[in-house]
């Protein structure tokens, strides 16, 4: 069973190669001429400036707390939901989806139904990314 687990972990690592090596704050990216980050596979991912400006309006005073890209975690255990982590990121997603602050009380993590994913990705295509998480 050990070998199978190792193979699964390698495959998950490979399908997550599009994730960033390190994330940058929204404020940092807005200062760059060509806002981008380096991915785990060594390539660069570029952000649309218009999208960054839109996020800034959603984040308000907390713009520097928002780390990009916002990671949408998809788990093998919790198939009907996804998770967003980080205070700034959670606030932005709640505002984007027009969710009441008191519906999802946790401040640093939010677990939402997957049917919100198309809306998020349509409005934030360059500033959000999927992460595939295996749990068993």
UniProtKB/Swiss-Prot annotation:
User: Which NCBIfam families has this protein been placed in?
Assistant: PRK04115.1
The UniProt entry's sequence similarity note says: Belongs to the UPF0216 family.
Taxonomy of origin reads: Archaea, Methanobacteriati, Methanobacteriota, Thermococci, Thermococcales
The SS bond pairs are: none
Q: What is this protein called?
A: UPF0216 protein PF0452
Pfam families the UniProt entry points to: DUF61
């Amino acid at each position: 069973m050990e070998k199978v687990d190792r193979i699964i972990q390698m495959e998950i690592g490979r399908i997550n190669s599009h994730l960033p090596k390190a994330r940058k704050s929204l404020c940092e990216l807005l200062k760059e001429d060509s806002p981008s980050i380096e991915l785990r596979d060594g390539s660069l991912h570029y952000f649309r400036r218009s999208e960054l400006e839109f996020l800034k309006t959603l984040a308000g005073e907390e713009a520097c707390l928002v780390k990009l890209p916002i990671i949408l975690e998809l788990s093998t255990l919790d198939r009907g939901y996804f998770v967003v982590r980080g205070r700034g990121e959670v606030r932005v997603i709640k505002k984007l989806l027009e969710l009441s602050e008191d519906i999802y009380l946790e401040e640093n993590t939010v677990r939402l139904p997957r049917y919100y994913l198309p809306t998020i990705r349509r409005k934030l295509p360059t500033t959000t990314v999927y992460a595939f998480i295996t749990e068993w």
